[in-house]
Curated annotation (Swiss-Prot):
This is (S)-2-haloacid dehalogenase. The lineage of its organism: Bacteria, Pseudomonadati, Pseudomonadota. NCBIfam families: HAD-SF-IA-v2, HAD_type_II. Its EC number is 3.8.1.2. It comes from Pseudomonas sp. (strain YL). Changing residue 157 to F: Severe reduction in catalytic activity. 1.5-fold decrease in substrate affinity.
Length: 232
């Protein structure tokens, strides 16, 4: 993997657990937290795809709020303004997966350029990584806002290529979202899919270059490659 000089990470679901909002959802609607979180995430993604197709962009914070409104209406829950604000705020304070902080530090020590490439707005990306104390670990926090379209549009992946100043073949794209990894693979990024939950990959004509179960396993890919290079 010595040809890899930079890594672009998806944020939501890859580095940070989107379902860490379950607790807040349970506080607002006891016993309904998991149900709310699952549908909220589903609709959030659907709204980004639909808005891209319709060329009707709103930023991710708005799409997230719209998805929450739908979720509560669908589940017959009364979402007042205060609860809506509290739950949307929870998306700015997501918890990183447990192995993420140490893994990012190890990748950084290897001299790799690190970027986040996210559907999130600049403010929401910064809020999430700063709340977790991880802001200094990244060279770039890249939002879709400049191109006003969501992943998996090629214009989004181009943002990472431009910001990192590397050819796409030298940028490893890491995502836990199979649809995102598929889009990145079609764009030309070497791609690593973090399959935390034992899912099957999308049937869309592409497969990831690597499939792992955690970010720590991404570090191990580089360690293994370095060990082989030393022996070779």
């Amino acid at each position: 993997m010595d040809y890899i000089k930079g890594i672009a990470f998806d944020l939501y679901g890859t580095l940070f657990d989107v379902h860490s909002v379950v607790g807040r959802c349970d506080e607002a609607f006891p016993g309904r937290g998991r149900e709310i979180s699952a549908l909220w995430r589903q609709k959030q993604l659907e709204y980004t795809w639909l808005r891209s197709l319709m060329n009707r962009y709103v930023n991710f914070q708005q799409a997230t709020e719209d998805a929450l409104r739908f979720t509560c209406r669908h589940l017959g829950l009364d979402l007042d303004a205060r609860t809506r604000s509290t739950l949307c705020d929870a998306y700015l304070r997501l918890a990183p997966f447990s192995e993420v902080p140490d893994s990012l530090r190890e990748l950084k020590r290897r001299g790799l350029k690190l970027a986040i490439l996210s559907n999130g707005s600049p403010q929401s990306i910064d809020a999430v990584v700063s709340h977790a104390g991880l802001r200094d670990g990244f060279d770039h926090l890249l939002s879709v806002d400049p191109v006003q379209v969501y992943k998996p549009d090629n214009r989004v992946y181009e943002l990472a290529e431009q910001a990192l100043g590397l050819d796409r073949s030298a940028i490893l794209f890491v995502s836990s979202n199979a649809w995102d990894a598929t889009g990145a693979r079609y764009f030309g990024f070497p791609t690593c899919w973090i399959n935390r939950t034992g899912n099957v990959f999308e049937e869309m004509g592409q497969t990831p270059d690597w499939e792992v179960t955690s970010l720590r396993a991404v570090v191990e890919l580089f360690e293994t490659a370095a060990g082989k290079a030393e022996k070779g």
